[in-house]
């Protein structure tokens, strides 16, 4: 098996901390089958009972409301609504390269290049609730969207 990434590793070698899963081939009795394992385990809840205490001082419900607001607006194609839940500049990563979207106007102008049907299909399978937390941010799915205390801060496109 080998580590798989989503482009956010910035050319660094993949390992358990920056990969989104493992892929490879399974061989047995002359049969060959593809194997794909996606990362997505849950973080443990801190002793305080606050899931997002490493991300924000606000309540978990308030933080998730922002993440869900972004998620619902994106899936609805609501550019203005989604921008309300973005922590600009927004980092957009794809194929090992990244760029910054610096404003709501830039997000609107780049919308169709960012929120492609393939990316939307990935997001539709995810749920912004009890998200994993790493390095002071919460991640949706396998790191497809990262949220800071102020809103969506990074997107990792397929």
Give names to the regions the model predicted.
Residues 2-12, 98-150:
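Surface-exposed, charged secondary-structure patches
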Residues 42-72:
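Short, low-complexity N-terminal intrinsically disordered segments enriched in polar/charged residues
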Residues 1-18, 23-40:
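Central antiparallel beta-sheet cores of small beta-barrel/beta-sandwich binding domains
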Residues 74-78, 96:
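Mid-length scaffold segments of soluble, non-membrane domains
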């Amino acid at each position: 098996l080998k580590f798989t990434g989503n482009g956010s590793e910035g050319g660094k070698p993949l390992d358990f901390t920056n990969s989104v899963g493992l892929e490879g081939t399974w061989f047995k009795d002359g049969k060959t089958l593809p194997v794909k394992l996606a990362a997505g385990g849950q973080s443990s809840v801190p002793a305080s009972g606050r899931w997002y205490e490493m991300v924000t001082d606000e309540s978990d419900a308030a933080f998730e409301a922002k993440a869900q607001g972004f998620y619902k607006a994106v899936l609805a194609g609501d550019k203005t609504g989604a921008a309300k839940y973005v922590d600009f500049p927004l980092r957009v990563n794809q194929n090992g390269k990244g760029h910054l979207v610096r404003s709501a106007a830039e997000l609107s102008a780049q919308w169709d290049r960012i929120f492609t049907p393939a990316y939307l299909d990935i997001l539709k399978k995810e749920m912004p609730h009890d998200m994993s937390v790493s390095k002071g941010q919460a991640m949706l799915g396998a790191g497809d969207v990262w949220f800071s205390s102020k809103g969506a801060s990074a997107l990792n496109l397929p």
